[in-house]
């Protein structure tokens, strides 16, 4: 049976997990079905982390963009802050596409937008990750459009990461086959 793959992306109020919180997390199957989980208030973070942990249990492989350097350490830190077990994230087979691009391709730049341009993957032009902290402050003040903007940004990142994953699949077949054998 093929490994069940999920693309993961998170939205946060800071690049540092001791200074910020998780405000949203997106999951998308390799078939393209997406789901967005959000914290409408900072006090919702613990339940968001629990919900995300539970959702990830049904997948064999996590695929991220720069997840090894950001998403997973951020999630690990926030889980531990709330007394939750980080091991489900840490034990999951993980393919970081940013690492794959850096080690297997020879591109001028290796950030997601450039890789999407290289593979002619269309992206929505909207808020960027750096806009999330400001948007979240607006959302906390009741601005529903700001909350929706964060959601749309996350889902766009997921769609782009999924498309890059499909392009790079020949380069990660061995990791997928290994995960298949483990499931």
Where are these regions (language model features)?
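Metal-dependent phosphoesterase core characteristic of DEDDh/y 3'-5' exonuclease domains
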Residues: 20-35, 67-169, 174-178
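Conserved RNase H-like, two-metal-ion catalytic cores of nucleic-acid enzymes
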Residues: 1-58
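Conserved short-loop catalytic and cofactor-binding motifs
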Residues: 40, 63, 149
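Hydrophobic "anchor" residues on beta-strands that sit immediately upstream
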Residues: 5, 61, 92
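Active-site-proximal or metal-binding-adjacent scaffold patches in catalytic folds
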Residues: 181-183
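Active-site flanking residues adjacent to catalytic metal/cofactor-binding acidic residues
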Residues: 8-10, 65, 95
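Acidic, metal-coordinating catalytic cores used for nucleic-acid/nucleotide bond scission
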Residues: 44, 59, 63-74
């Amino acid at each position: 049976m093929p490994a069940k793959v999920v693309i993961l992306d998170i939205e946060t109020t800071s690049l540092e997990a001791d200074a910020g919180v998780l405000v949203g997390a997106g999951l998308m199957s390799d078939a393209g079905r997406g789901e967005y989980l959000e914290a409408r208030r900072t006090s919702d973070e613990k339940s968001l982390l629990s919900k995300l942990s539970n959702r990830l249990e049904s997948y064999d492989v996590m695929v991220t963009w720069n997840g090894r350097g950001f998403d997973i350490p951020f999630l690990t830190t926030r889980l531990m802050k709330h007394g939750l077990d980080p091991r489900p994230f840490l034990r999951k087979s993980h393919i970081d596409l940013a690492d794959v691009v850096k080690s297997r391709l020879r591109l001028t730049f290796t950030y997601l937008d450039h890789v999407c341009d290289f593979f002619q993957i269309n992206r929505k032009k909207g808020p960027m990750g750096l806009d999330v902290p400001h948007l979240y402050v607006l959302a906390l003040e009741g601005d529903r459009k700001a909350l929706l903007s964060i959601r749309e940004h996350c889902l766009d990142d997921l769609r782009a990461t999924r498309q890059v994953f499909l392009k790079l699949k020949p380069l990660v077949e061995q990791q997928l086959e290994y995960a298949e054998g483990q499931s």
